């Protein structure tokens, strides 16, 4: 009996160590860089308090003089453009892409979760509606709090400290990634799928969050592109991310050669053979986990 208790305690220790020392922070050097830079893999479902468990995260941030992220949130004109881009053209009617039963099903789901139906939201693109609906699911089932998400923590700190923040994507690219990276009929199917099978979306995000807590970035990439992943974030999205990573390497290279860049990006973009870390390594940069 004593032996089993000791084994149980040991397993708990290993589990705790794995979570609190997840490999999500990396040092980037070499390839003519005059000083190291750092890249932090983030997960929007994680509370900002998780950063306290990442060894040397604040020390590495303090050693940098700029923050680089996917899209700079301080660009208010860009945010206005994004809101406009979320609207359907006047010539497109969402009702025409669904049966009456499907349209009513979506309308009812939106009313229950967003307190608004398609009478008010029917001019929005289906990709935007699907994301709004998913966010409400995550708030309800995974305690997602956008204001406390670790995803934008360092960006906000930098802005408060007058440290420059650079976005890897411009406004047009960001609008494409959010609203138009998939054909319109796919977006319509995706919205219906999210409404009909919300539990799949929640299970997916829960699994991704758990992998992130253990620093399993490669597993996260494989999980997204797996053939049996039928959620709103799947293989077609992974292909878009992989292609974009190649462009990001070009845009990051000047910053990395200058050094002292603190990069924060969604962990899904980083792992796997097509992930940003592998592509930076292929470009000649040295990548090393900070907490090893």
Question: Model features per residue range: what roles?
Answer:
Residues 234-292:
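A cross-kingdom marker for long, charged
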Residues 18-19, 47-50, 240-245:
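Short, solvent-exposed secondary-structure boundary motifs
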Residues 24, 30-232, 236:
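Structured, acidic catalytic/metal-binding patches in enzyme active sites
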Residues 1-27:
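Bacterial Sec-dependent N-terminal signal peptides
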Residues 9, 49, 273:
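Active-site-proximal flexible loops/turns
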